[in-house]
C-alpha cells in the first residue's frame, strides 16, 4: 500500500530531508510543496538535492512523490485579472518543478473559488486557465482536488469536477484527488455508503480519473461545508470508514496522503501524528489512547 503524508521540503536538505522525514514515519509515498504554499518564492531546482533524495527514496521503499500546488493559485477568480494571470503563470512553473522531481506523477490543485461570480462563471474561468496552462506534453497530471464547499469554492460536487474536465482540451493531463474530509464535509456519505459514493464518482467523473487520495478525518458533521481536518479516528468520519477507504479494492493502487493536524498542547512543541496513523491504517488496529501523553484526552 502506498501511504504517507505531507512532509516538509525546507532547510538545507530540501527534498532529501523530505524523504528522510517520510521514512521516519514508515511511509511509502509522500507529498510536498515545492516552496511555501502561501507565496511565490522558490529555490532553484538545482538546490533541491533531487539526486540524493531519489537515491534515499529507493533505499527506503518510497515509491512516489505527490506535489501540492500552492494555495495562492486561484484559477476561478473573475474579479481580478492580475490574480488569474498570476495563477496561470505560476501553475505552469509549478508543473515544471514537479516534473523535475522525477518521481512525481500528480500535482494536486484546489480548482479555485469564484469569489461571488457564481459556480458556472467560475468553472468557465478555471477551464480557461487550465487550457492556457496545459499543452498535452506534461509528464505530470494536474489532480483536481474535491473540495468541502467552504465559501465560494468550486469542486464541492462530482458534477463540478466533471464539468471542468469536460471543458479542458488536453484533459488526459487531468486527474482527481479525492479528499475524505472534503467529500464528507460536502455531504457525501463515506461512513455508511462508501461503495455508493465511489459508484457515483465513477458514473459522473470516472473512477479511472482518481490519482491521489487525501486521507483525513473531519471535525465536522457530514455536510457542514467547513473543511477542518482531524486526526485519524478522532473525528466525525471515524477509523473504520477511513480504514475501509485506504484498503478498498478500487483504490488500492493509489497514493494515500495524510494531512491530519500535529498533536500537542504547546503550539511550539506539536509533533507529527503520521507514524502512528500510518501504522494503525496498515494494521487495522485503532488505538484511542495514543494521543493521551500529548493532548491529555482520548475520544
UniProtKB/Swiss-Prot annotation:
Q: How is the cofactor bound?
A: Binds 3 Zn(2+) ions.
Q: Which domain of life is it from?
A: Bacteria
Q: Name the positions where Zn(2+) 2 binds.
A: 145, 179, 214, 259
Provide the catalytic activity annotation.
Endonucleolytic cleavage to 5'-phosphooligonucleotide end-products
Signal peptide as annotated in the record: none
GO process annotations (BP): base-excision repair
Q: Which UniProt keywords apply?
A: DNA damage, DNA repair, Endonuclease, Hydrolase, Metal-binding, Nuclease, Zinc
List the coiled-coil residues: none
Output the Gene Ontology terms for molecular function: deoxyribonuclease IV (phage-T4-induced) activity; DNA binding; DNA-(apurinic or apyrimidinic site) endonuclease activity; phosphoric diester hydrolase activity; zinc ion binding
- Binding-site list for Zn(2+) 1: 68, 110, 145
Q: Which annotated residues bind Zn(2+) 3?
A: 182, 227, 229
Q: What is its EC number?
A: 3.1.21.2
Kindly list the cofactors needed. Zn(2+)
Which CDD domains does this chain map to? AP2Ec (cd00019)
- Family membership: Belongs to the AP endonuclease 2 family.
Q: PANTHER family, alphabetically?
A: APURINIC-APYRIMIDINIC ENDONUCLEASE, ENDONUCLEASE IV ENDODEOXYRIBONUCLEASE IV
Query: What does the protein in this record do?
Result: Endonuclease IV plays a role in DNA repair. It cleaves phosphodiester bonds at apurinic or apyrimidinic (AP) sites, generating a 3'-hydroxyl group and a 5'-terminal sugar phosphate.
Q: What name does UniProt use for this protein?
A: Probable endonuclease 4
Organism lineage string: Bacteria, Bacillati, Bacillota, Bacilli, Bacillales
Amino acid at each position: 500500500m502506498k501511504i504517507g503524508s505531507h512532509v516538509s521540503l525546507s532547510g538545507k536538505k530540501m527534498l532529501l530531508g523530505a524523504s528522510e522525514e517520510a521514512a521516519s514515519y514508515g511511509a511509502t509515498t509522500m507529498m510536498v510543496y515545492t516552496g511555501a504554499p502561501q507565496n511565490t518564492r522558490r529555490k532553484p531546482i538545482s538546490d533541491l538535492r533531487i539526486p540524493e533524495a531519489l537515491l534515499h527514496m529507493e533505499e527506503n521503499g518510497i515509491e512516489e512523490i505527490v506535489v501540492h500546488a500552492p494555495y495562492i493559485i486561484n484559477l476561478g477568480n473573475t474579479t481580478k485579472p492580475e490574480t488569474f494571470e498570476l495563477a496561470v503563470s505560476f501553475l505552469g512553473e509549478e508543473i515544471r518543478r514537479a516534473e523535475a522531481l522525477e518521481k512525481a506523477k500528480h500535482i494536486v490543485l484546489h480548482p479555485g473559488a469564484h469569489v461571488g461570480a457564481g459556480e458556472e462563471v467560475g468553472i468557465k474561468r478555471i477551464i480557461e486557465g487550465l487550457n492556457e496552462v496545459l499543452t498535452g506534453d506534461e509528464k505530470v497530471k494536474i489532480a483536481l482536488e474535491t473540495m468541502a464547499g467552504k465559501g465560494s469554492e468550486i469542486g464541492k460536487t462530482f458534477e463540478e469536477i466533471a464539468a471542468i474536465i469536460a471543458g479542458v482540451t488536453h484533459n488526459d493531463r487531468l486527474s482527481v484527488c479525492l479528499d475524505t474530509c472534503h467529500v464528507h464535509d460536502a455531504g457525501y456519505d463515506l461512513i455508511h455508503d462508501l461503495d455508493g459514493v465511489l459508484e457515483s464518482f465513477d458514473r459522473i467523473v470516472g473512477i479511472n480519473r482518481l490519482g491521489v487520495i487525501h486521507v483525513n478525518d473531519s471535525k465536522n458533521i457530514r455536510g457542514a461545508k467547513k473543511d477542518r481536518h482531524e486526526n485519524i479516528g478522532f473525528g466525525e468520519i471515524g477509523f473504520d470508514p477511513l480504514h475501509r477507504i485506504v484498503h478498498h479494492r478500487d483504490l488500492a493502487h493509489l497514493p494515500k496522503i495524510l494531512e491530519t493536524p500535529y498533536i500537542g498542547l504547546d503550539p511550539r512543541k506539536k509533533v507529527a501524528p503520521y507514524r502512528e496513523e500510518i501504522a494503525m491504517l496498515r494494521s487495522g488496529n485503532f488505538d484511542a489512547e495514543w494521543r493521551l501523553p500529548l493532548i491529555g484526552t482520548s475520544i
